[in-house]
Every structure is written in structure tokens, then in C-alpha cells.
UniProtKB/Swiss-Prot annotation:
CDD domains: Cyt_c_Oxidase_III. It catalyses: 4 Fe(II)-[cytochrome c] + O2 + 8 H(+)(in) = 4 Fe(III)-[cytochrome c] + 2 H2O + 4 H(+)(out). GO terms for cellular component: mitochondrial inner membrane; respiratory chain complex IV. One of its GO terms (molecular function) is cytochrome-c oxidase activity. Its EC number is 7.1.1.9. This is Cytochrome c oxidase subunit 3. Component of the cytochrome c oxidase (complex IV, CIV), a multisubunit enzyme composed of 14 subunits. The complex is composed of a catalytic core of 3 subunits MT-CO1, MT-CO2 and MT-CO3, encoded in the mitochondrial DNA, and 11 supernumerary subunits COX4I, COX5A, COX5B, COX6A, COX6B, COX6C, COX7A, COX7B, COX7C, COX8 and NDUFA4, which are encoded in the nuclear genome. Gene3D superfamilies: 1.10.287.70, Cytochrome c oxidase, subunit III, four-helix bundle. It is found in: Mitochondrion inner membrane. Component of the cytochrome c oxidase, the last enzyme in the mitochondrial electron transport chain which drives oxidative phosphorylation. The respiratory chain contains 3 multisubunit complexes succinate dehydrogenase (complex II, CII), ubiquinol-cytochrome c oxidoreductase (cytochrome b-c1 complex, complex III, CIII) and cytochrome c oxidase (complex IV, CIV), that cooperate to transfer electrons derived from NADH and succinate to molecular oxygen, creating an electrochemical gradient over the inner membrane that drives transmembrane transport and the ATP synthase.
Length: 261
């Protein structure tokens, strides 16, 4: 910041947006190859490229914000607006899935047997694993709030404990969801019910994995004393994202698991 007469961060040229876009392309084609030809080579390459991009991009941002002091209050304000707009875009993303579900379920066509769930589909019991998943995510919402309050009050160890509990609950949710998918009596190819169910809950599961990764990074950063009560936007963004994931799950549970069954 020595020869700078403004509070904005002039970012150095970075290769990570390019490698990130490449990894997204590889993962998309990899998913198609896996679905149609049962080959996971391209998908694994895409995931590896994505992991490397995430690691190196996060490393650069941590260096610029924590060690070089580029994240001034003005920059943080811009980041906050960016995160809010990103979450709004995600809301619209999930709106499309809910639209597809309600479009199909509110007026089932004769091909579906004129009823919902369609003839031949045995839906999952909403009072079994889905209800446990709901409790797990609601508990994680409480623990992330505990972590935030602990950080604001300077209780570092309490914050680490709460963050660890949140991550553990996120991983537990993912394992429960995976076991539910494995044991489900229908598949993604079982008509509109299977496709809307697996795409909506699958994308939510992906967001839980992303949120858990975000929180794991925050956990290791807190171990290295990167956050203070006044400078912790990385953690705040992760907490906002986690609450968003919580709320989306409540809508999924009420719409697809409970009402849809």
C-alpha cells in the first residue's frame, strides 16, 4: 500500500480464474463421460484441477488480506456486496429446481398416472433419514452462530470447538445423504420424479460439501490466528453461505420430502 493514494485493491494478474474455468469444463465433460460411458478418468482430472485451483486461489487471497493488508474497509465492503449477490444468484438457481418440481407435481400429466408421486414410485419416508438430516443441519446452524459470537467476544477456543462441531455435522449430513441415495428405491432416470429429486437434493448436497470445505479453511486459518473480532470477513462469508444452505434444505424437506411424498 506504500505508493497508493486510494483504498482499493489493484489485483495482480492471476491464472486461477483460467484454471478454474478449465476445471469446470473438465468436470462437466467428466460427468457426461461417467453417466454415459462409466469412465471416471476425465471427472477425476477435473476434480484434481479444481482442488489445486481452490488451494492456490485461497492461498493468494489469504496472503493479500492477512499478510499484505490489501483488504481495507472499502475492499471488505465490496466483498460483502459480492457475497450477497452470489447468494442471491444461488437462490435463483434453486428457484429453477423448485419451479420444475412444482410444475410437474401440481398438475401431473396422464403419462405420470395423473397422480403425484407418479405411479410406480415409492417415495422416501420424510420422518426417517430426511428428518434426521434436517435436525443435523439445524444443529449446525446453531453451532456456526455460536462460533461467530465466540469470535466477536474473543473466545478463540470456543470458536474452534463450535467450528469443529459445525464441520463434523456437515460431514455427517453428507454421509447420511450418500447412504440415502444408495438405498433409494428409485433412480435419477425414473422419470420426472427421479430427475427433480436427485438434481435438487444433489445440488444441495454439493453446496453442503462446498460450505464444509469453506469452513475447514476457516478452521485452519483460526488455528493460525488469522481472524480478529474486527477483521474476519472470510469466516463471515462462510457463515452466511452455511445459513443459506440451511434454509434451502428446509424448503427441500417441506416441498420434496414431506409434501411431495
Amino acid at each position: 500500500m506504500t505508493h497508493q493514494t486510494h483504498a482499493y485493491h489493484m489485483v495482480n494478474p492471476s491464472p486461477w480464474p483460467l484454471t478454474g474455468a478449465l476445471s469446470a469444463l473438465l468436470m462437466t465433460f467428466g460427468l457426461i463421460m461417467w453417466f454415459h460411458f462409466n469412465s471416471t478418468a476425465l471427472l477425476m482430472l477435473g476434480l484434481t484441477t479444481n482442488m489445486l485451483t481452490m488451494y492456490q486461489w485461497w492461498r493468494d487471497i489469504i496472503r493479500e488480506s492477512t499478510f499484505q493488508g490489501h483488504h481495507t474497509p472499502v475492499v471488505q465492503k465490496g466483498l460483502r456486496y459480492g457475497m450477497i449477490l452470489f447468494i442471491i444468484s444461488e437462490v435463483l438457481f434453486f428457484t429453477g429446481f423448485f419451479w420444475a418440481f412444482y410444475h410437474s407435481s401440481l398438475a401431473p400429466t396422464p403419462e405420470l398416472g395423473g397422480c403425484w408421486p407418479p405411479t410406480g414410485i415409492h417415495p422416501l419416508n420424510p420422518l426417517e433419514v430426511p428428518l434426521l438430516n434436517t435436525s443435523v443441519l439445524l444443529a449446525s446452524g446453531v453451532s456456526i452462530t455460536w462460533a461467530h459470537h465466540s469470535l466477536m467476544e474473543g473466545h478463540r477456543n470456543h470458536m474452534l470447538q463450535a467450528l469443529f462441531i459445525t464441520i463434523a455435522l456437515g460431514v455427517y449430513f453428507t454421509l447420511l445423504q450418500a447412504s440415502e441415495y444408495y438405498e433409494a428405491p428409485f433412480t435419477i432416470s425414473d422419470g420426472v420424479y427421479g430427475s427433480t429429486f436427485f438434481v435438487a437434493t444433489g445440488f444441495h448436497g454439493l453446496h453442503v460439501i462446498i460450505g464444509s470445505t469453506f469452513l475447514i479453511v476457516c478452521f485452519f486459518r483460526q488455528l493460525k490466528f488469522h481472524f480478529t473480532s474486527s477483521h474476519h470477513f472470510g469466516f463471515e462469508a462462510a457463515a452466511w453461505y452455511w445459513h443459506f444452505v440451511d434454509v434451502v434444505w428446509l424448503f427441500l424437506y417441506v416441498s420434496i420430502y414431506w409434501w411431495g411424498s
